[in-house]
Every structure is written in structure tokens, then in C-alpha cells.
Amino acid sequence: YRAMENALKDAKVTPEQIDYINAHGTSTKIGDGVELNAVQTLFANNKNFSMSSTKSSIGHLLGAAGSVEAIFTALAIRDQIAPPTINLHNPIEDVKIDLVPLKAKEREITYALTNSFGFGGTNASLLLKRI
């Protein structure tokens, strides 16, 4: 939560301005649940953003994961396409976030966040803007 909140604050961007989030999304029940809860809390007033996990397409690249996901996020902004969460056949029903299941989605993306969380509380959230 704080990493995303600080990224927004540093960039002087509101949660309502975010169009896309590249979640850390390792497909673990605890980790994904914590991230989802943080996103739902911080972005409670934003009803129009998409969130996906590109790890579903490439696997977990460990130390390189954050860099590769930042590239995915930059390409999402450039191409105006939210990448899919591959194999998300049964999303949680009460989640109101567009999780971009199974296939990419064309959408306007001006501001995007990419999250990278590590063992021991090493957390980063990078905010990117279309120019």
C-alpha cells in the first residue's frame, strides 16, 4: 500500500488518474490477496482502471522481474493495450477491478503503476506516464 501511495504522492498523481496497474501477482493466495486488498483500498474511488499480472505470461524472473514488468508497463502505455492475466479462468467474483483475464484489452492508458515486491519487505511501485 505505502509503496503505491508514495509513488502517487511523489508524482503528484491521484489514485483516480491511474489507468493500469501491472500487479506483482505471483499467483500465491497470500501475496496476491495482500496486493489486491491494498489496491482495492487505495483505488477505492477509481472505477475505471485495469490490473493484470504479466508474470502469468513470462513466469517469475526473480531479480529481473521488476525490470521486465516495467518494460511491459511502458509498452502497455505506448501501445494503449492492457496485457492479459493468462490462465485467469475463475476470477474472484466480488472483485470489481478489471483483471484483464485471458486476452489483452485495448484501452486508454495515460498513467500506469508497476509493482515489485520482494522477500523481507523490499517493495517498489513505479509510476509511468504517457508523453
Question: What do the predicted segments below correspond to?
Answer:
Residues Y1-I131:
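Conserved "HGTGT" condensation-loop signature of ketosynthase/thiolase-family condensing enzymes
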